Amino acid sequence: MEPIFVGKGTEYRKKYDNYVEILKERLTEKRFFHSLSVAKEALRLAEKYGAEPEKAFLTGLLHDICKDEEPKRQLQLLNEFGIMLDNVEKGAKKLWHARSGAVYIREILKINDPEIISAVRYHTTARKGMSLLEKIVYLADFTSEDRDYEGVEDMRKAVDVSLEY
């Protein structure tokens, strides 16, 4: 099952079919749907706030590429490419997928756009001084159509007013 794309979303979904196929292999069905939903929402927010729509779509699509990877494999990937976790990060396994995902995108998929890599890296923790793309992906992950936590509708309304909340 996939979200329904319209307009540029349909075009980008076709253009990045190779990445979609990789995601199908790497992610559970639920996480795959989530990744497509985040891509859709990131595209919408990019169009609304003046970011690059295609870059936002691609980043949203790939943001959880390592989420379903075993923690041991995530650590191996990080170590293989010289990324060492600090003591705080070592204790937060649920956040490793953002670091390993950024490495995977750069080293395995050969996407060398620093903005995309950074947006994937910080999509779980955020950071001070986030770029527009980082904010969009962070908030798209939080408000995508598959999310159903208490207060999500309020968050969706808020991101339609500003990305600065």
Task: Specify the residue positions occupied by each region the protein language model found.
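Charged, low-complexity surface segments at secondary-structure and domain boundaries
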Residues: 1-8, 153-159
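Divalent metal-dependent catalytic cores for phosphoryl transfer on phosphate-bearing substrates
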Residues: 21-25, 45-164
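N-terminal glycine-rich anion-binding loops that anchor highly charged ligand groups
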Residues: 33-34
